[in-house]
Structures are given as C-alpha cells and as structure tokens.
Design a protein with these regions (language model features):
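Surface-exposed loop/turn positions
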Residues: 12, 76-77
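Short amphipathic alpha-helical segments
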Residues: 28, 51-53, 92-94
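A short glycine-rich, Lys/Arg-flanked "PGG" loop and its adjoining helix->strand segment in the class I
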Residues: 57-75
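Class I S-adenosyl-L-methionine
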Residues: 83-127
C-alpha cells in the first residue's frame, strides 16, 4: 500500500500503519478501542488490469477495515467502505449487515458506469 498525505482538521488524529498488520494488541497499545464514531475506508488496491485479482485485493482491504472498525467503533457507530464489486461482494455485504443495525449499498453518480467501485455503509454498530 502507498501511504498518502492529506490535510486534515486540527482535531483529527492520524496513524500510519499497514492495515493488513493491525490487530487488537496494536490498537490496545495506542488506546484506540471503542473510541470512534465513524470508520471510513476509501482504500483501493493498485489495479493490475486483472479485474478478478483487483476485486480480491479490494475485498482483503475491506475485510481488514471492517475488522479494525469492530475494534475501534463505539456502539452505534458507522462504517463506510469502498469495494470493487464481484462475487465476494455479497459475503462482505453480509459481514456488514451482521454487525450493524442498518446498511446501505450505493454507487456514487461520479463513478464511471463500467466501474466496479461501490460503497457500503453500516450504521448503528451493534458492538
């Protein structure tokens, strides 16, 4: 993954890490458990041109983001994640559905018609 720098509001905290290596111990060490109202993942893998491989990598990133969300969200919190839609999408949607009171799936109007990019939103984290 390529880390990028973005300008954030002053009250924002940032952490830099490889999302695929973050676990409960890493979060506990930084006292990050159950502190957040929202987890937003706009991650996407570097695309290879192989749609199946790109979608599988996207699924892996989204599963990692959801795993982190489960550890850091306050009850009632929200999760937003961009994923490339393919055959694993339904599995990911079910994972979100099982952890949140409400969920919504949408494709932004700004996305190209042929793009497999889609967003899933979970609201009301069950904790």
């Amino acid at each position: 993954l390529k880390a990028i720098r973005i300008k954030l509001p002053p009250q924002t905290e940032t952490l830099t890490a490889d999302i695929l290596t973050i676990d409960r111990a890493w979060l506990d060490e930084r006292e990050l458990g159950n502190r957040f109202n929202v987890v937003l993942s706009d991650m996407a893998p570097a695309t290879s041109g192989n749609k199946g491989l790109d979608a599988a990598r996207s699924f892996q990133l989204c599963q990692a983001a959801l795993s982190i969300a489960e550890m850091v969200l306050k009850p009632g919190g929200s999760f937003i994640c961009k994923i490339f839609q393919d055959e694993e999408f339904n599995e990911f949607a079910d994972n979100v559905r099982n952890r949140f009171k409400h969920h919504k799936i949408f494709k932004p109007r700004s996305s190209r018609k042929q793009s497999k990019e889609i967003f899933i939103v979970g609201m009301g984290f069950k904790g």
